[in-house]
Amino acid sequence: EFIWLDMDPLYDTPKHRSMGEYGPKRGVDNILTALDDYHIKATFFVPGIAAEKYPDTVLKIAESGHEIALHGYAHENFAHLSPDEQREAIQKGINAIEKLTGKKPVGFRLPEGDCTPETFDIIKEFDFLYDSSLFDNDIPYFIENGKHKMTEIPMRWEMVDFTYLAWGGIFPAGACRVAVYDDVLDNWLRELNAFYDMGLCYVITWTPQTIGS
């Protein structure tokens, strides 16, 4: 539910919390079942606070052989944080996941997908092997600052389920309406075929509260 709370204080209602709570309560299990049926391993980007609030769910992901990567601490928008606040959010998130799983996460994705000019230098301070937050390419590449080299695995909004399937009743008109499922699947399959033919890196992003239902 942390994505709703970070978007706007107006979303701190039982309805919006319940939409987010569906993810760890039911959505994750549905996704794990589907992944197991097709023998697929995935990366789950987890906010640190989710590891604290839903430890059994996060442990189940890890014990099923999937990667746990970091998604901030409380799904903070890094564009609204000072450099020190960004460091604190990353460190708290790392601590929460490492305490629960026994492993330090090696991957990172920005909550809300936004940041400040300093953010990537800050991320590299924590020795992540890769980040997956930017939209400037369709193949992985290295980000270097002279001290640390990190792989960037770019993503695309049109391959994020939230873009099509999230519903919020108090969003502006025309925003966040649920799309026709067949159309969404057709979009994703067209992208997959094109990426395969062109030898690109296909990164699809699903959230338990949306695709998990």
Language-model region placement:
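Short, local alpha-helical segments
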Residues: 172-176, 204-211
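Glycine-rich, positively charged active-site loop/lid region within alpha/beta enzyme cores that binds
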Residues: 154-175
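Catalytic alpha-helical scaffold of carbohydrate-active enzymes acting on polysaccharides/glycoconjugates
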Residues: 1-107, 112-160, 182-204, 211-213
